Amino acid sequence: MGTDALGGTINIITKQEKKDYLDVSYGIGSFHTHKADLNAQFVEKKTGLIVRPTVGINYSKNDYRMKNVQMRDESGDNFIYGNPKRFHDGYFSLLAQVEAGFVNKSWADAFFVSASYSKTDKELQTGSVQNKVYGMAERNSDSWNISARYQKYNFILKNMQLNASLSHTWDHSLTVDTAYRKYYWDGGYIVSQRLSLIHI
């Protein structure tokens, strides 16, 4: 997985070797996109306990140009068609996870429990159509997850395989736009009638 902006996804792939490792990566893409990933594994030699921390961060300003949209001219008095940059379409995501468990035991070929937290902040530039421009609207979400997985070959009977998993997630999402403003593609705005009435 992984994309180059436009609210890209975090790419996390864990290794399967039973040894310590640490992988750190950082990348830069178009539209002010930045990605950073950390994947590690630590094995306790005596018990064989495996701990795998993972962190992924993705940020993009997404300030690419729109094509042939209506916008105000420099005076602000007339409308023209131009190619302005998106000015409120940033994206930030964070995923932090820790997994712990065992492999190649008499009672399990693999058993892991994990806990993770993810966060996404997305600026909203337009509504369902591109001539509806926003300048302060945002969508924020948080998610917690706990899970467990168990794998055993030759379970009870020879060649019988058991794969079991449990997972529970708590999600919270909020979309906010408290600014009573009408925005234009040049980044300017006028105060909406509703806000004017509030101040009266």
What function would you assign to each model-found segment?
Residues M1, I13, S25-F31, V43, ...:
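Outer-membrane beta-barrel pore domains and translocons
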Residues G27, K46-V129:
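Periplasmic-side early beta-strands and strand-to-turn transitions of outer-membrane beta-barrels
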